[in-house]
Amino acid sequence: GGVSSTNLTREEARHRSEIIKVERYHVRIDVRGADADGATHFTSNTRVRFSTKEPDTFLDLLDGEIESVIVNDEEIEPEYDGSRIQLHRLHTHRKNLVIVTAKLPYQHTGQGLHRFVDPADGKVYLYTHFEAADSRRVYSVFEQPDLKAHVDFDVIAPSGWRVASNQVHEDIREEENGLLHDFALTPRMSTYLTAIAAGPYVRFDDEWHSRDGSESIPLGILARASLAEYVDHEEIFKITKQGLTFYHRAFDYPYPWGKYDQIFVPEYNLGAMENPGLVTFTENYIHRGPATRSELAGRTNTILHEMAHMWFGDLVTPKWWDDLWLKESFAEYMGAHASVAGTEYREAWTNFAVGRKAWAYTADQQSTTHPIVADIVDLEAARQNFDGITYAKGASVLKQLVAHVGVEQFFGAARRYFRELAFSSATLDDLIRYLEKASGRDLSSWVDAWLKTTGPDVLLPELTIRDGVVSELAVVCDSVDARTGRNVNRPHTLRVGLYSLRGDDLVRADLVDLTISSPRAPVREAAGKPAPDLILINDDDLTYAKARLGATGTKTALSHLSGLAEPLARALVWSMLWNCVRDAKLKVQNYLDAAALHSPKETEPAILATVLQQLQMAVENYLPDSTREDARRAEAARAWRGLDVSEPGSDLQRIWARHALALSAADPDSVERTRGLLDGDVTGLVVDPEMRWQSWMALAALGRASAEDLDAELERDRTKTGVAHHMAALTARPDDVAKQEAYRRLRTPGELSNEHCLAYIDGLRTPLGVETFADLNSSYFDDLEQIWQEFPIEMAQRLVVGLFPDGDVAEIADRWLASHQSATGGLTRMVKERRDAASRAETARDFNN
């Protein structure tokens, strides 16, 4: 079919930005009934002032019941199709004022104005999330990033509530049955960045001062009342202040949004969102038990990522979604860079190398890979591109660009970019222009090779040894565009590390700087050196490529990986080994044995957690059925041993405990250990509510937890997460009736919130529940289009990915794709990605047979 009117195209947006300039929105949102049982709608009144060169255009508003539309003092009959309000006979020589009043629904999908009822105390909370195009679920708007405007929010809310928006309060006054909160006018900004939150949130306050005392920024942290006791506001404020100090120095442009509030919200779809002055975060960043250092480092990274957006993304905004990567790669890069430069979390690039980069390599090797600069023709395509390429590959390539032009030049360019483009929109060409000025280099061929192609390069060491000495070392670079098959010769600025065994230590004997601009780059400095035991091609992780270890290096790594003193080097080698497992170039058993040997000696929490997760993935997906069950038992036993030898009370102990519980769900021999952990038998281990539920989940999956056991646990923890874990655990039991009911509810539109949808999927997808799930889900491929049509996109995505069948289904998926070529891009993209994962797993299972 044609493009639905809810789906704005790039051409329509381009046309609108040529003819329209928006002056300001005055938005009044009335949520006075929100705290009543079963409240479904709120009232929205928008007054938008704008000029236009043409008499006809449209405003965006989704799913509204329109009460009135007034155009320049004249009430008109609304011409509205559920997503666009058509406007005619507008003034082309003076300003227009359009006033729209409408009723709109509260959402339960985490987009628009989300309404949540806290099971702990019955309190109601509201918050908004608009990226990419959901401000139109709350007010009438020209919904595109380059039509910036000043926004003036008023919110009428129940009297006991706290209300926040992008700016500070100007006034609060009595209204019938409530209070009117009048917020200050915002600077010029994109509408997807506007935000409000309302409810009985608890608030913490602090203030940041610049070093010379000339500037101060009021800081706030908000969270639900039932979570407030767990909010470690001192740590969060500390990181926030360190970040503001760092960015003021690095960007040399004062924070432009007045105050800085950070709010933790329930049932949130993402990690966080950079609404200026009111940054939203998932509540997963608030820990109800001890947080490991890698969790704190991860949260720090996110806080600093969002803060970077205050300049890059909010102050200067990508003109359209094809430059989404501009802001995301930059923020992702800055999250790690600022962690290292401004906080105690100096290990950020190690965590990036072992975690985020794996996401990039996975995404970039799927059939759906796309260039970093993607071709985004409409909003539907934009939604699909919040992915591992836009974020993680983008940041890796930006890190390579910094290595290529120099860090001072990079920040110099950023400063000019903010200064000269403040409060406007920009494209890739703008950023590159500033980078070329700052570095004095022509970057056009670099941009073409890196940003307009797909797939990672493969880098291999080619080593000739004579009499124990290197006669020649070269790096062979296989640089192919995954989509076209053409050679693209991506240039690399990198370092090659030569490592030698001294006892059990793997010591870096030499580090060589190398630029690669051809298929084979000789490493001249290596000639005449003693033969290395391991060659780390991308040492210090400056570039983005799949580097291989070669036969000698792989052997050394498998036996001596923990002998590497530098955490970043260990992270890189683990990542290289994992890439080989995924590519069916290294046997799973070799990887498992290496993990058994080295993970008990691993001291970096992020590396340990990632390796243990990947090990479980390898057992479940890449081993043939014939050996999987034995491997599950063996790995669960190793996990409990790892827990036993870890230091009581340490982060590493928590990671081993989580790993042991994750593996126990598939190992009947682990029942006693799991019960013991639940009863507090593990010395030094704090068993918080999350870990209790993880234990119950394992017992439930093994058929060793009754509904009564799980109900009793819910009584202990009647909270948002408690309710979701309870649903998952009830479904995980080998009880066909419970599983059928969960499946039925999943497939009923409007039945579940986003979080409960995931809980049921988790409960159905336990390793031992595979057969029952396959029976329930046998019509998956027949039902795909129906799912896509019946559910809002956030839910449809969860179902398409979450219910994709296990096993050898690549061929069935191929048949579906071949016979559904007219299905929407969003749906086919997800099926292709699951199909690719299934096919990769089939190849690996054959290889490991």
How should each PLM-predicted stretch be described?
Residues G1-T43, S68, P119-Y125, P145, ...:
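N-terminal, polar/Ser/Thr-rich
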Residues R10-I19, T101-D152, G199-E207, D541-P567, ...:
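Glycine/proline-rich low-complexity spacer/linker segments in large multi-domain proteins
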Residues S44, F130-A133, V141-L304, Y333, ...:
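Hydrophobic helix-coil surface modules that form long, contiguous segments used
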Residues R47-D63, E143, V151-P158, D429, ...:
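Surface-exposed beta-strand/loop patches in extracellular or lumenal glycoproteins
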Residues T57, L62-P119, S140-E143, D182, ...:
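A surface-exposed beta-strand-loop module
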Residues E65-N72, L443-S444, T454-N538:
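Beta-strand-rich binding/interaction modules
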Residues F183, S214, I221-D478, A482-G485, ...:
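Hydrophobic alpha-helical and helix-loop surface patches within well-folded domains
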Residues A358, G388, V470-E472, G485-N487, ...:
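Long, ordered, helix-rich scaffold segments
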